[in-house]
């Protein structure tokens, strides 16, 4: 039996008998605003595990990049290749292989979520996003908008490419290769999602550098937790119907929790506890994770 090495917001990482292999165990927990909600979503972990595995296999089949997936060994578990994690900024050796890149890469295709809120505050400009100054929520960007955030700080923070290079100590060519992979992966996701009437709005991804420092896609992506999705038919009618964890965020924005939490963090106070979800929202969320697995993969859940 292995031992638990790490307890994340939505999954556990366990050791195995092979020192180079780890086991991901996905839980039914759900988190928003870097807080774990004290409500469980039935079969959510299974949905995340199976959805990510679907994307990993497609990406390998199309030769986009390597991945760390070894095999799916249970409905809510998978085996992955271990990568070394070095949290100290700038400390990763330039010749190290199978090492985690301590950054998150966000790719946006439509104006929504936190990008919309930053756009309204003037923190993101029309020129940066490739949209008109008077554009509305949900506007399609003229080209994908890439952002980099920190990984090992208390809260994720948007950073420049220059700071990303300092924190990770990877080369500019390696960062550009990561960006290139993100765009290719998102093109694949967009193509597959469109088959079942879905729009891929945005998403985040994490990487390692594997053999010969080649880019390796790791962790989870292309799910309702890391990515945002809309219904394509509704979008054509001018409506952005959230088919992702965003509607859970919207619930807490509506209750005022998000504003209270932001105020506490801005003043350096302790986070206020996040309340449980109403049963109706739990049921709707469980149904969403099940139905979206089927729409994303064209497989039965």
Which sequence ranges carry the predicted segments?
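Anionic ligand-binding catalytic core segments
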Residues: 121-177, 214, 221-301
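A structural signal for short, well-ordered beta-strand segments and their strand-loop junctions
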Residues: 106, 200-204, 217
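Short, flexible loop/turn elements at secondary-structure junctions
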Residues: 28, 109-111, 207-211, 221-222
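Short acidic, Gly/Pro-enriched loop/turn segments at secondary-structure junctions
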Residues: 116, 212-217
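A long amphipathic alpha-helix within ATP-dependent nucleotide-binding catalytic cores
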Residues: 170-201
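A short glycine-rich, hydrophobically flanked beta-strand micro-motif that places a catalytic Asp/Glu
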Residues: 70-71, 193-210
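Short acidic-glycine loop/turn motifs at beta-strand connectors
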Residues: 17-20, 209-213
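Active-site loop/lid in soluble adenylation, ligation, and acyl-transfer enzymes
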Residues: 2-149, 268-301
